[in-house]
Amino acid sequence: MATQLHRSLKTPAAVAVRGLSRAFGPRRVIDNLDLAIRPGEFVALLGASGCGKSTLLRILGDLDPEFEGEVVVPSRRAIAFQAPRLMPWKRVWHNVVLGLPGRPDRKRAERALDEVGIGHRADVWPKVLSGGEAQRAALARALVREPDLLLLDEPFAALDALTRIKAQALVAELWQRHGCAILLVTHDVEEAILLADRVLVMKEGVIAHHEPIALDRPRDVADPEFARIRGALLDWLGVAHGAAH
């Protein structure tokens, strides 16, 4: 396959994808997809399971080189998954700076952990963290790299409802503070509307719909415009309005 992945910010977009295709055997998961994300823009990506959302995110994160087309992404980018993927044999603070050049910088790790509200857990082993704390540690690990692009692959899916609400608020706050572009893959329509500047719907390997979100922040699910947008997105997803969030 012809692979062209460029790490650059010398374009007006934080992400520029042209003619992207990815096949697994005879099945074409992504089919000539185009996508642009502006610097500092928060974009949420919705779609049915298996439509190619996570594959797209992995390509943008340079975790899947077997694609056709052109992908332009920032040199500084980070990714956080649904599973925090912390190394169990390293303390939390060490996990945060794992992979950074030079000697492990504890102070840098502590600053990142403080920012996500778990500075007091720097010296514990990952196995003693709650699900919400582990996800915060994963966010700290991503943000300590000072990314221009943050890729989030269903980071809240395994959290209970209350912890999920807190995690959503934290991500919104961190985005405002850091100003990086974010691409969030999610199955939760309300989450997408609450957080994003723009919501995309992926179907049959392409971006089938763009929905700009012009609501003021913080957003209210009881707002009639919120309900209208939710209904429109559910229509694109082929879901009855009373059947999903």
UniProtKB/Swiss-Prot annotation:
Reaction equation(s) it catalyzes: ATP + H2O + aliphatic sulfonate-[sulfonate-binding protein]Side 1 = ADP + phosphate + aliphatic sulfonateSide 2 + [sulfonate-binding protein]Side 1
Pfam families reported for this sequence: ABC_tran (PF00005)
Stretches of the chain forming a coiled coil according to its record: none
Protein's cellular compartments: Cell inner membrane
Known role: Part of the ABC transporter complex SsuABC involved in aliphatic sulfonates import. Responsible for energy coupling to the transport system.
Subunit-level organization: The complex is composed of two ATP-binding proteins (SsuB), two transmembrane proteins (SsuC) and a solute-binding protein (SsuA).
Gene3D superfamilies linked: P-loop containing nucleotide triphosphate hydrolases
Family statement drawn from the similarity comment of this UniProt entry: Belongs to the ABC transporter superfamily. Aliphatic sulfonates importer (TC 3.A.1.17.2) family.
Top enzyme category: translocase
Protein name: Aliphatic sulfonates import ATP-binding protein SsuB 2
List of residues binding ATP: G47, A48, S49, G50, C51, G52, K53, S54
Superkingdom of this protein's organism: Bacteria
Alphabetic keyword roster: ATP-binding, Cell inner membrane, Cell membrane, Membrane, Nucleotide-binding, Plasmid, Translocase, Transport
UniProt-listed PANTHER family: ALIPHATIC SULFONATES IMPORT ATP-BINDING PROTEIN SSUB, TAURINE IMPORT ATP-BINDING PROTEIN-RELATED
Main subcellular location: membrane
EC numbers on record: 7.6.2.14
GO molecular function annotations of the record: ATP binding; ATP hydrolysis activity
GO cellular component terms attached to this protein's record: plasma membrane
Membrane topology (UniProt): Peripheral membrane protein
InterPro entries named among the record's database cross-references: AAA+_ATPase, ABC_transporter-like_ATP-bd, ABC_transporter-like_CS, ABC_transporter_ATP-bind, P-loop_NTPase
Domain ABC transporter: 15-229
